[in-house]
Amino acid sequence: MTGPSLFEPGMIVKHPNQPEWGLGQVQSAVGGKVTVNFQEAGKVVVDEARVGLVVVSYG
C-alpha cells in the first residue's frame, strides 16, 4: 500500500534520467503513479517508487 503522493496536479517536474523529455506538468498522482505531460515526450505515467522526479515549480 502506498501513502499520499508528494506530487499534485499543476506541479512542473523533470525526469532525472530523461532530460531530453523537457519539463513536464503533473496531471494526476494516484496510487504511486504520476501522470506527467512532458514537453517533448508527451503523456508519461511514472512510478514514484522507481523514479525520483525533480520538482522545478510548485505550479
Residue ranges and their predicted role:
Residues 19, 39-41:
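Glycine-centered tight beta-turn/hairpin loop motif at sheet-sheet or coil-to-beta transitions
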